[in-house]
Amino acid sequence: MSGSDAAELFYDEARFARQGAMPEPVRATLLGKGGVQGLDGEEHRHRKALFVSLMTQDRVVALGTRFGEELAVAATRWRSRSEIVLYDALHEPLARAVCAWAGVPLAETEVRRRTRQLVAMFDAAASIGPRHLRSRLARRRAERWLSNLIHDARVSRIETPPGSALGAIASHRDLGGQPLSLRIAAVELLNVLRPTVAVAVFITFAAHALHLHPEWRARFRAGDDTDLDAFVQEVRRFYPFFPAVAARVRTGFTWRGMHFPKGRRAMLDLFGTDRDARTWSGPDEFRPERFQEDDGGAFGFIPQGGGEAHVHHRCPGEPVTVELMKIAVRFLSTEITYDVPEQDLGIAWSRLPALPHSGMIIRDVRAATTGPRHIL
């Protein structure tokens, strides 16, 4: 299924259900079993409200601020290296930032291990063989880690900052008034941590776009943020992230001459919808200015799901994604300068998540005050 009309149909709860729709290997790695993505109806809306409550404007800005601080610290290390793979280098500052923001204590000795676990859950989830097995193992270990933290929070062994994700999830109660099991609570806390670290994919694509469209970097370097939001949204529209989401037909029906039998798995093409010529003029062109006029609507622009976040299965963390991308674009444009050496910048379409083949290598990183060095 592809296109805004198909997306609107896909998010009709009377016709499609989410429970058990995603393949087991994806649920065992990327999503976790029992999490909000696989719920339906009132149970889904109740659980979703938990996540929406964490995404107030003040909290989103606070996470962005913390990420900016972590980026600045990371960049001091980048400057001591001849070159870095940007995608890989972004994981740790994102993990540090979101754990601090979420109230998840992270000892310095744990940072690398926990970051690897969070990355494995989205970077290797769709692989086969040993990488997929490592993703499953990372999921089990991360759930055990966070289950213990949630238990400690519930018995007041550790303090949870007001408004933190750890505190909110530890104290959340289901529709029956019962606290979430430790494992399900851990799955939901990972649904805060993991996708935040996965924003590294979008930031890598933003750096790719800044390199291929240097006029935009020049505008941001000059301090013109007028179209920063439009630039970030166009990166999210133009570049692939995870390509599709799944549902199962709740009751059989026919739509536009096509029969959907009960129980049939349906896939919504997220990337294809974001490149659909019925919604977007020149969909295969990178044109941020398009967002000055039209945002594609709730079912036409769906890089992280369609509909409304508080009702449908649209990611409630979209404001976080946008904020972190803005922080990163400003940082790459105004805080540091760097060279982009010869490399394979073609998109690895068969990879999930898709990325530039090289991972976006940058070289000779310097503080911006040393003067522009970006090779275009």
Explain the meaning of each model-derived region:
Residues 1-376:
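Cytochrome P450
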